[in-house]
Structures are given as C-alpha cells and as structure tokens.
C-alpha cells in the first residue's frame, strides 16, 4: 500500500479509536526515521492529555491496526500530546483557540491591513469568519488570512 494510502486509512481508524476515548486526533505523521518507520500521533482533549490517555490510545489503536493489517512493514507507534506549540490544522481550531497567541506561516506573502506583505504572522488569534483567519498582530496591525493560504499555524507560548 502506498504511503499516502496508509496515512489516509490509519487516519480514519485512529480518529474512530481516539474519539471513542473522548479525545481528538490533532496530527499524524508516518515517516522513516533511521532504519524504521514511525507512526506518530498527537492527541488532545479538553484540559489536556496525560500519560494514561496516551497509553490507552496506543493500546487500543495497536489492536485495531493489527487486525486491519494496514501497515505491512515494521513500524513504531508513538502517541503524545501536541505540546505547548500545538498545531492548528482544522477550521474549528482557529475558533477554539481564539484569544491565544499564534504564529501563522502562509504559502505566499500576504498583506496586513497596513499593506505590508509577509509570510509570517505573529499575534492574537481573533477567530475565523467565512474562511478567513483573523489575527491582531503584535506590531499593532491586523491580518485577514484566507484559510487555504495557511501553510502552518501553531499556538505560541507566552512567557
């Protein structure tokens, strides 16, 4: 099975298992590290996840993956929290984390409300409206970033 197909199939199975445990799948990676493949899942829930949550996901998902036989080669399964710099992947994430400090990178330079073009936006997430991510930038400007132009977005930790 091609890597893209493996990722797609594992994502469906993982979302079913993880949601049944009251958590959400934040991100999934399947890549070669050294000599072996690593399937890495990042999970979260309201209030955050702990070691027992990660162990439960690992146990449950391992059983499902063994039965479904999705991955034919040897791999390691890792389950963890997304960390303090949690990625924002879904439209819902941009609403859920409204008011938090975010760093957004875009595929191409986009203007802020002062006309300054940039690819990196750092500021307070104001939400998402009609597919446009709204950010109050640290420098005082505002930015309206079309969701489809977001290459990468993460929460930023404030000291």
Curated annotation (Swiss-Prot):
Biological process according to GO: ribosomal small subunit assembly; translation
Domain of life of the native organism: Bacteria
CDD domains linked to this entry: YlxS_C
Matches recorded under InterPro entries: Ribosome_maturation_RimP, RimP_C, RimP_C_sf, RimP_N, RimP_N_sf
Locations listed in the record: Cytoplasm
One term under GO cellular component: cytosol
Keywords (A to Z) from UniProt: Cytoplasm, Ribosome biogenesis
Short name of any one Pfam family annotated for the protein: RimP_N
PANTHER family in the record: RIBOSOME MATURATION FACTOR RIMP (PTHR33867:SF1)
Entry function: Required for maturation of 30S ribosomal subunits.
Family: Belongs to the RimP family.
HAMAP family, A to Z: RimP
Protein name: Ribosome maturation factor RimP
Species whose genome carries this gene: Geotalea uraniireducens (strain Rf4)
Encoding gene (name): rimP
């Amino acid at each position: 099975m091609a890597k893209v197909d493996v990722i797609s199939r594992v994502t469906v199975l993982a979302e079913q298992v993880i949601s049944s445990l009251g958590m959400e799948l934040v991100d999934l990676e399947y890549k070669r590290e050294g000599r072996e493949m690593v399937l890495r899942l990042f999970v979260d829930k309201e209030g955050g996840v702990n070691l027992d949550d990660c162990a439960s996901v690992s146990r449950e998902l391992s059983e499902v993956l063994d039965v479904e036989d999705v991955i034919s080669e040897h791999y390691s399964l890792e389950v963890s929290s997304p960390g303090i710099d949690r990625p924002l992947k879904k439209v819902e994430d941009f609403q859920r984390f409204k008011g938090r400090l975010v760093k957004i990178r875009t595929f191409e330079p986009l203007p802020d409300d002062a006309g300054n073009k940039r690819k990196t936006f750092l500021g307070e997430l104001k939400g998402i409206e009609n597919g446009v991510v709204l950010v109050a930038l640290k420098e005082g400007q505002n930015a309206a970033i079309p969701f489809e132009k977001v290459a990468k977005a993460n929460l930023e930790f404030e000291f």
